[in-house]
């Protein structure tokens, strides 16, 4: 599984790199604080379908990086051609 640090993600965003950002936390967590992207709670990840025309990397995040790893493992089985990245240690560093 590929990981990306928060500083690497910020660099990609500053460079204007095309990517998809997915938050797999629950709705209340997302509403309280998020770094953008699409909310797809871990409990609903089986409903997600990637856009066939979008081949950009998918950055998946949660609070500490555990739920995002689970989501990526499941999605990688279903969508092996997509380049998934786990946000290392999640967004917990931003919550403190």
Predicted regions, residues:
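Rhodanese-like catalytic fold shared by cysteine-dependent sulfurtransferases
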Residues: 1-20, 24-57, 66-96
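Short, surface-exposed ligand- or partner-binding patches at beta-edge/loop junctions that are enriched
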Residues: 61-62
């Amino acid at each position: 599984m590929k990981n990306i640090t928060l500083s690497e993600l910020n660099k990609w965003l500053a460079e204007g790199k095309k990517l998809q950002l997915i938050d797999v936390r629950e709705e209340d967590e997302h509403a309280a604080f998020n770094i953008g992207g699409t909310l797809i709670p871990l409990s609903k990840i089986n409903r997600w379908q990637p856009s066939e025309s979008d081949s950009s990397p998918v950055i998946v995040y949660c609070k500490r990086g555990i739920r995002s790893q689970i989501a990526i493992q499941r999605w990688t089985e279903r969508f092996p051609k997509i380049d998934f990245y786990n946000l290392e240690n999640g967004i917990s560093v931003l919550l403190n």
